[in-house]
């Protein structure tokens, strides 16, 4: 599972001094299934919350490893909240090479797609409206949008085919 974080633009009517929200994303390496949430900051606690509440809880399959950049939300001391959450859930951690964000290309690309197809195409009335539209877009991305990297299938179709195979 590839993870990344992006600072979101201010909403219409917000001032430059207002606190910015952050978009957390996770994309499955095999199926390209997307998980995303908007959280109030880019801390280890928010990353841990994203992992447990927005990734592990709704994900129907086992997450063996997460791959992220070396940001402070993902990497730190021995008692780092995100690292502890990974450890407690039996999830390994791997990191990109320092100063090489392109080595986390899947997460970087899905953020670009989200910003182009979701955020830049709409005007949001409120943070709640933006969150609601993010949920709608993630559903569209996973169940309707064909993916070139999946030979025109959706992440849902890839997972459906995988889980309908007989167990050997």
PLM regions with names:
Residues 1-27, 33, 49, 61:
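Mobile-element integrase/transposase regions
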Residues 5, 29, 41, 70:
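Residues immediately flanking
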Residues 19-20, 36-61, 65:
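Active-site beta-loop-alpha junctions of metal-dependent nucleic acid enzymes
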Residues 33-37, 94-96, 120:
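Short small-residue beta-strand/loop micro-motif enriched in glycine and branched aliphatics
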